Structure formats: C-alpha cells, structure tokens
C-alpha cells in the first residue's frame, strides 16, 4: 500500500531502548513517525470522550464522570496494547455497544446502569476465558485467507462510509424512497467544512507531505474555529470525577432478565466484541503489512488478551465495553507500525482527562476526510480475492458489502462465514471446512436468529 511517509526512513533511534523494545527499525519506522501516527489516531477517535457520555447519560450515568472514566480506561488500555502486544491499535469505549447498554439494557430491559455494566463485565470475562484457552486465536487462524482479506476491505468501506456520514455528506434517504440513505447536497456549514478538509487531505497526501493526515485534521479544525462552526470551550481545564468507577452489579442480571434471556444477551454482546476485534485486528495488520503471507498475525494472542480486558475494564469502570478501534487505521496510514503508536494515543488520552472539553474543538467534520482516505487505502486488499471463483468470491463479497450497509462489522463477518460453509457443503466439499468454522457458523446462525428466539422466550 502507499503510505504518507517513506517507510525506509531511518529510525533515528539506532540502538536506543525504544527502537529495540518496539522493533522500530525492523518495521521500517521511527520514533517521529510513531508519535505522528499516535497523534493522528488520537485526533480521529477523541470524539469518544464527549460522545460516550452523551449516550450513557441517557441511562442515568453522570456525564462528567463518564467522560473522565472514558479517557482514563482508554488511556490505560492503549498503553497496555502498545507495551504488551506491540501493535499500532488503539482502544476506547465501543460505539454501538454503549448504545445497546443505554437504550437496550437500561431503558428497554429495565436493568439499572450498574446491572447493565454487570452484563458487560460478564461477557468480557467469557471472552477473556476464550482467549486464555487459545480459542480466539485458533478461530482467527482458521479463517480462510480470502475472508481475512474481505474483512480488511469491508472495514475499509465501513470506515469510508463513516467518514461520509460524519461529514454530513450522506444521511437518511426519503422514507418513501427505494433506499434508506441518500447523498446530501452540501447546504450546511458542516458539509462544506468536510469538503474543505477533504480537499486539504487529498492535496497533502498526493504531495506525500509527512504528517499529511494530522496536519489536515488540525487545519480543518482551525478553519472550523475561525468560521464559528466550533467554539473554544470555557473552561477547558476540569477537575475530573471518577464516580462511575466500580459501579457494576453482577448479582441481579440473571434474576431481572431471567436465565435464558440473560444468557442470550451476554452471548450477543460477547459475539459482537469477539468478532469486531478479529475483524479490526485482521484489517489493521494487513494494512500495516504486519500479517504473514497466509494472513496469520504474529503475536496475535497478546493482542487479543489485551483487547479482551477492554470489556471487563470498561464495564467495571462504568463506561461500557472498550474495544480495538478501526480508526487505528488512520495512524497506520500515517506510518504507524508498532505499539509505540498506541502508547502515544494512550498518553494523550490520559492527559485529556483534565482537558475533556477540548475534544469538542475537533469536530467530526475535521476527521471525516481522513476516514474517507483511510477507507481508500484499505481497499487495496481486494486485489488478493479471486472473484472468478464463486466459492471464494461470493462469501467475500457478502463480507465486504454488509459491513457498511448494516453499519456492523459482526454482521458482515457472520454472513461471509455462514455462506462460506454453506457453499462448501452444497459442492460436496464439507471436509475442506475447518472444524472451528463449523462452530463459528453455528454461533452466527444463533446470533442472526436471536430475534426469533427472544420472541419464543417472551411468548
């Protein structure tokens, strides 16, 4: 793939401790590049500091405490990911899961906020157990190479789609029309800011300017301040509150929901966490050229271990499940190749604990152009998929398309896995299917049929 920097650049740190620990020279990167990549990733995902509280406060949680807790947990997990796994993957509270916690578990199912966080802790413990016995890594290694590449492409299109949505260029279509989304003609200040940012991003990237992505974000954010789209917060320094730490309850989950309903709920959250991370890790490793030729990821066990702590830590801190972020691809596009990138992101999150209001001066319209470009960069993996082979091409296509169309990574992965197994069976090649692929396909059938199961339980 094409990077914004020359990856043959000298590490500039020779035999230093950082170079040796993070294998910078071996991976064709440098301290400066990693720091720049870390800043880029942080800027692209800093929105979670104010978005997570806005969602969880609906469920009755204290917004200021959630903001501080979000930055704290994300910071610690990012540092841990960098030091333990040495991958340029950042972690923070997962969007989607936090919405399911607030609107699903609390407002719909009637759990207390502490009880909802208890569900997150329980599903995190299940995932942690699966990592401990090696099942999560074994499943990753059992996935066919074509589907691994399809996952990377699908995540790229998902990121690109997020960029268009965040930038205000794509939105809800005519409710009476044939499609649920539509192009929004730039008739707002936000949309024009996105287009301006995209122009800046394209020019800087095409000219191979070092730091193109982080420069683009900062310039676009500055333009937003100048034209009055955003305002400088007052105050911008706050005394953090950590009132949500330890606010989780494991005791009443099964009694309030019933055993079967609680088990299905935990299973659903677990499956989402489990395969979202597999998808993100696969896509980022491929983009960073850290995966082997057969698609396996060296040292993935350590990566999965740290990620599996995210749900437990997020639930225990009362800020919802933390997971590996697909926005890490922005830092990789900036040249990040090691865990030092993640450490930089973590340090910035920890600093942000005292400056949480400042996150709002970098609007989504400033980061949307970078996401659009990153989506393009990840699309190159599609060249490794043989669409002339129906067995390989059709499941791959489902995986690629359903991620952005459903706005869910797990749905795309599940559809591709189930279709892969189905086609092998109908062609008399069932013996070619890895045993774990059978298990995963069955799990996804249960996942897709969960609505029917819930109706049967409530009937």
Predicted regions and their residues:
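Helix-loop-helix junctions within the multi-pass membrane cores of secondary transporters/permeases
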Residues: 16-52, 73, 94-103, 107-152, ...
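Membrane-embedded alpha-helical modules
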Residues: 109-226, 230, 343-459
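Helix-loop-helix hairpins and the membrane-proximal interhelical loops
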Residues: 2-65, 179-183, 215-301, 444-446, ...
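Residue-level signature of catalytic and energy-coupling elements of molecular machines
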Residues: 35, 55, 139, 211, ...
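Juxtamembrane transmembrane-helix boundary signature
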Residues: 74-95, 126
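Hydrophobic/aromatic residues within the transmembrane alpha-helices of Major Facilitator Superfamily
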Residues: 39-46, 76-79, 83, 160, ...
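Membrane-interface helix caps of multi-pass small-molecule transporters
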Residues: 54, 79, 83, 104, ...
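Loop-to-helix transition at the N-terminal end of transmembrane alpha-helices
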Residues: 60-79
